[in-house]
Amino acid sequence: MKTLIIYSSQTGNTKMVCEKAFEYINGEKLIIPIKEKDSVNLNEFDNIIVGTWIDKANANAEARKFINTLSNKIYFIGTLAASLTSEHAKKCFNNLIKLCSKKNNFIDGVLTRGKVSKDLQEKFTKFPLNIIHKFVPNMKEIILEADSHPNETDFLLIKDFIDKNFNS
């Protein structure tokens, strides 16, 4: 089995968890940023894992556009600041499933936490939260808590995801 991990990363969170996934996968594998998608023949891969950061409760635009070009057996790894048990995370997970299932044989996905970009954190200090992001009363708490992610807890989620889908 040959697996491609292809990711879009704004802050480095998604790149980091995708690199962990790459370490954990047994067998033939390749990892590249989506920007390098034209350097590979996607038809050579049995499995494609798309790494994305969450933007407006879905894959970011670059990853979304790429997923819409696929018709393969795919998986996703997503990173977001919100707690993984939050309603927002559940909505994101379901939106990613819908996106990945449109034209593909979607198999499985996993979300991990990641820190908020410094640029967005700065915007939050200059403008009312509801102008930039849907108003969430505890947004500052979420941002501060997310700052320690991705961490070992997130990497364990990735390891479990890889072991379940690729190494069993």
Predicted regions and their residues:
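N-terminal beta1-alpha1 ligand-phosphate binding loop
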Residues: 2-24
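Flexible, glycine-rich phosphate/dinucleotide-binding loops
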Residues: 12, 38-40, 83, 118
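Short, surface-exposed acidic/glycine-rich loop or hinge patches that mediate macromolecular interfaces
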Residues: 8-12, 36, 53-57
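A short, well-structured beta->alpha microelement
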Residues: 27-40
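Short, surface-exposed connector motifs at secondary-structure boundaries
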Residues: 1-2, 46
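Conserved beta-strand termini and adjacent loop/short-helix elements that scaffold enzyme active sites
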Residues: 6, 32-34, 112
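FMN-binding flavodoxin-like domain, especially the glycine-rich phosphate-binding loop
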Residues: 24-30, 45-50, 55-168
